[in-house]
Amino acid sequence: MFRAAIGIVAFACATSSQFALADEDNGSSRRIEEVVVTAEKVESTVSDTSISITAIGEEMLEDLGIQNANEFVNYIPATTRDAYDIRIRGVGRNFRSLGGDPGVATYYNGIYSEDALIALTENGLFDVERIEVLRGPQGTLYGRNSIGGAINYITKGPTDTFTGMFRGQLGSRYNQEGYMVLSGPISDTVGYRLTMSDRDREGVQRGQYGTPDANGTNDTNTSLAIRWNPNDRSEMNLRINKRNSSRDIGAGTILSEGWGDFRGTRRTDVFAFGIRPVTATTAGAYGFTDPDTGVVAYGAPVRPGVDIAPQSPNPGFAGRGYLNGNGDSDFDDVTEEALTNGYNDEGFDQMGAQMTFSYDLGEDLTVKYLLGYGDFQYTYHFDYDQTDAPISDLGVSVLEDVWNVSHEVQFLWNPSPDFSLTSGLYYFQSDRLQDYRLRNATAQGRYTNAADYALWDAPNPYLGGITAMSTLYASIPWLAGPHCEIDTAPVGGACAGRWGGDPEGATYKHNNTNDTTQTAAFAQGTYNFNDQWALTLGVRWAEDRKSVLENRFYYFEFNLVPYIRGTVLDPLAATYGILTDPSTLTDLAFANVMMGAATATGDAESPITPTCALTAVECANPLRLNGGMPFSGGTKAVDEKTWSAVTGRINLDWTPNDDTLVYLSTTTGYRAGGYGLGILEARVETPQGTKPVSYDEEEVLHIELGYKATLLDGQLQLNSAVYTYQYDGYQDSVDIYDPSQDAFREIPTNTGSAVNSGFELEGTWLATDNLTLNANYSYTQTEYQDDVYLLEDDNPERPIQLFGEKRFNLKGGALKGIPTNKFTAWGNYVWDFETTRLTLLAAYSYTGEYNGSALERDFDKIPERTRTDLSLIWETQDRRRRARFFVDNVFDEVNFRGIGSGSHLTNYKLTGTLLDMRRFGVDVTVNFGG
């Protein structure tokens, strides 16, 4: 594939001269207007920049109605998005933890921003001059977290004369958006630009059975830009914004659930999820055939309180058997709807500032100082069980508080026409706090109320009047401990104690911090040997230091029965008239009897009767499902590490004529190591105590051959590139096999070497004076190169309770999140009248299927998707009045951004994140002044 792609570029180079010399009359007198970019810290055009870069200008953003991340990535080759991050050529963030970093750097007016989606959602991309997307490692000039590329958002600045704009949008689902701009001079040396936006839309996911709608918009933002030119040699640009968002966050889409004949249905008749091994003659038995070996085994639903199951009841129990769609694997009947208990709230309060001051020290030397500041709080309360049933209500609450500041000094030196040098120093500091809670405020009160240990705490005559629990205090002292809260554990240690209840019903909490500092120094110079050949060399040294704290609290169930079987258990059971035969009364069932949650029946198939009905909303002694006895636990871990690297760039340019550029580039990239904060198993014991698991830096070697040409006398533009990446220490979060424990653990780790190769092609053709056509295509192939073993526990056709754990070796498989094929085409046709203009636009995008997890399986692949948009624009010739009528996703395609699969713990639930379905509306703009 790689050699074939090189051949394509070589063919294009060989034929470019013929195209350039061709005097073909295609009926067009227009010429392609170059977009000026600052990809290499100095102004140049896309065609003159030896980087794979796509620049989306203001006109394209407005004409195509690009207003969010989902629409934006459709127009960029080899680019997709995750929940909070962007992937370029598959490089992104494979796991979301507080101690990790993104793989694509986000810049706002040339200054680093911590969160990609802050920039991609501000103002609905209104008042943006252009967006530059740089593909491939940008480790020399951009540095921090740009191992996959960089995205730079350039906003509009103050104008020399007074101008203004009002813009309003009305659309389906009561979408209402208002925008305003006022810009002009304050004095001869100072100018301003004030931009305001207010966006509001009701939830597009229709609440089912009278429940609230989800996925709405309620967003306001105000920004002020100031430009100051104190003299001819200096300029300062400052932009400050304040933003607030409070909305109903989108709910997950439940696509399927269940196993066996119940696959594609929602089980509301079982109190606890899980499968137990049984014989073929057991009531309710279902036969499974191992797809690998052909072995047949039988399973049946677990018996609540008898067989080990997840600690929370089935959230759909005694509720509605709701699925979005018909449960099929084609998802054709899925639509925008949700079923929740009504709390899907998201809040976002953000302030940012970017300041650039430049001073010309001479004709050939300019110094720049760049200051960046960001501060935001992000909160959400999310019902993630996709049901409104009253027995169990699973939810998550998050508060994330982020502060960051950056300083950069750049020196731009041009001592001669043949040589230029950009160098600088960089400092970045970030403090992140994340408060995270998993909760279930119903669940019959099992989490909100303090546990009643009943017979475990009752004085027993056989034991001389002491309690059964106290017989184990010497060997398990924490059994007597008080309720352990989130800040109880010592640093590097743990605490455990009785369950005292949590007012919110929290089963897990963490309060984590990550303080990050990066310092860097860089330089990149270009030497022109002659009019055709130029060499660029760049180097960057960077050091990252992370200091982390993870403070956890959790609910867990522990079974004491195995510790007292025999000499203590039998007489104890006899005292209370409890049978002890383990074939009749399992350890879990016995524990529930001792907890006062059940009574023994003597029936081997149904050995206990719950004290409270399973449908009871409240219960003083609820049936325990996992270990039988509830306790509280907590840990506190701290650590600090430093990573550093030297990265570089070597680039050779060949410019055979003014319209052609061929470049060969070798670049290295680096992403710092980090920690798996918030990942339950990501802990390690050391002589200094418990510490969070860390992972090493990720490095990449990137080689790219590019070709850019303007042909047909300025009416056709082609940009292409063929590339390969070689990763070392590829970062991911996987279930890996730990030989020392003979078990699988989910931890963040470096999975070794991986390769990623592909090619891209972008083109613009001014076909006639009225017709413009654009297209891009990308092809990507990826492969794990080292042995990485993963556990599969979420395949409903092969339950691990029946067939045991199955290990997969990822070696030779594809990396996740990367479509092999991606294609977009768009065009417009213009009718010019004396005072007005009418433009018809159409856009089509295709993204091929790709892996949603590290395992290559059909049932959780992200399906291929297509989208077609149409719009009609009426405007005056001076563009002072404008109306755009649009229909997005014309054919109402069902498209997904993500697919997630659960294990037996969630009854193999399959969920998806649905992209926008059909939308329509009108967008009106009025300009004044100038």
What residue ranges belong to the model's regions?
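Periplasmic-side early beta-strands and strand-to-turn transitions of outer-membrane beta-barrels
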Residues: D160-T161, Q169, V181-A280, Y286, ...
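Outer-membrane beta-barrel translocator/receptor signature
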Residues: G103, D115, F126-R135, T140-T222, ...
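C-terminal beta-signal and adjacent terminal beta-strands/loops
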Residues: T442-G445, Q726, N770, E834, ...
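Structural signature of Gram-negative outer-membrane beta-barrels, strongest in the C-terminal barrel
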Residues: R227-N229, L412-N414, S420, G424-F428, ...
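Membrane-embedded beta-barrel scaffold of Gram-negative outer-membrane proteins
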Residues: T356, D360, T366-G372, Q377-F382, ...
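Acidic, small-polar-rich N-terminal luminal/periplasmic segments of exported/outer-membrane proteins
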Residues: S28-T161, L705
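Transmembrane beta-strands of outer-membrane beta-barrel pores
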Residues: T155, G168-S172, D198-E202, K242-S246, ...
